[in-house]
Amino acid sequence: MRKSNYLWLLLVAVLLLPAQEMAAKKKKEKEVTDRELWAGVLYQMAAPVLSNMSEGKLQENMQVELSPTWDGRDKRVTYMECFGRLMAGLAPWLSLPDDDTAEGIQRKQLRTWALQGYKNAVDPLSPDYLLWSENFQTLVDAAYIAESFIRGYNSYAINQLESTQKDIEKEIKTTN
């Protein structure tokens, strides 16, 4: 064989060796299940909203950018829409029983933040008191919050919010 053929063969071997090692390493790593992946995505989306809402800092920390064609509505409807839609989607998952898995720990943390967020949403003294009236959009957004109670109906934690539920009911009645 000619010297150039040996060089090509050596080059191919050098290039393929790291690929083989990477493939072997990948097999050793734990494969993430679809559930783990989506629970992680859910936590990443919900944690910034719920942690801030529970501390009364959502409206302070969530910057709202308006379109040049904004129709002039009060931009505070954004916070109610954000919290309401998030909770409507999250409530069934938060209703699952606690466990010691990574998902269960994240779920428990989100539930704790969410329960405090509900309280702040209806507390007129909270910086995160939501805009319940003054705008037609609030009726739609309030419906998402109400839906979260329906979708999380079997949750012991949500049932503990009886006074907050009454406050939410009172606020919904003020929507336009």
Q: PLM ranges: what are they?
A:
Residues M1-K27:
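Bacterial Sec-dependent N-terminal signal peptides
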Residues A23-N176:
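Ser/Thr/Asn(+Pro)-rich, low-complexity disordered segments
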